[in-house]
Amino acid sequence: MINKIAVLGCGWLGLPLAKSLLAKSYFINGSTTSAEKLPTILSNGIAPFLVQLGSKLTGDDLQLFLNVDLLIINIPPGRSTNQADDYEAKISALTQEIQKSTIQKVIFISSTSVYPDNQTTVDERCNLINESDAAKRMIKAEEIIKSIPNIQSTVIRMAGLIGPNRHPGRFFAGKENIPAGLSPVNLIHLDDCIGIIEFVIENDLWNQTYNGAAPSHPLKLDFYSLASQKYNGSLAKFLSETGNYKIVDSRKIVSKGYQFKHPDLMEWLLQTPQS
């Protein structure tokens, strides 16, 4: 039975997730790499911890942070080359600490970027043949997590993230000649990121891999043109061409009974107030 949960990485997704889990009566530890964010975590009723993940895991009261039943790992690779190169070492170091702890289960937040843009629909059964260095690093991280001895782990591959303070219109507002306007989008709202994670926990869906992407895939041209207008009233002009793309299929988690809160991305966008 899961009573205590640690959220490693209380950022845009991690903090709302921790708050939602707390509201469901779980005891929550939350980590950040920034001392300035500790008061925010504490003010939400979450036990705050300053944790740095490098070639070894460091932080005050590290054993106390990991004294939980479930660890949710929400730490994507850094954007710089050096940060990304260290990602495998960071995940490996983390697994060493997991094995010393009371942790029984792990949820690893991955990305649909592990799938190649091969002009087809992709699901969890696909071979992950992707030449992108970033994808290779994430695939390797998934493998490391899945191989931790005596730990039940589930990987959730999230699509592009949208929601509060992450309005999709900000990406292309006012730009012109944007390529691949006829390619479909793969996105997921924050509410469904949290919803899928909680669904996995509540239904004991362990030793699995699930995609997290809204079941609707509007064209990039249609979605981001409307998003840009809703964001600041400016236009985004796309080229009417199909570039490299994929359509991420999330029917596996739906088949288990999950119902998306925002299945229709265009409908969500229409209902979103203008920024």
Located regions from the model:
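Substrate-positioning beta->alpha
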Residues: 155-158, 167-168, 178-201
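Mid/C-terminal beta-alpha module of Rossmann-like enzyme folds, strongest
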Residues: 196-250
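NAD(P)-cofactor binding segment of oxidoreductase domains
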Residues: 63-107, 140
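Conserved beta-loop-beta element that borders a ligand/cofactor-binding pocket
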Residues: 140-164
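Conserved Rossmann-fold NAD(P)-dependent oxidoreductase catalytic core, especially the SDR/UDP-sugar
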Residues: 92-131
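C-terminal amphipathic/interface module of NAD(P)-dependent oxidoreductases
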Residues: 47, 51-55, 234-236, 240-275
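N-terminal Rossmann-fold NAD(P) dinucleotide-binding loop
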Residues: 14-15
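Glycine/proline-rich active-site loop of Rossmann-fold NAD(P)-dependent oxidoreductases
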Residues: 139, 162-175, 199-210
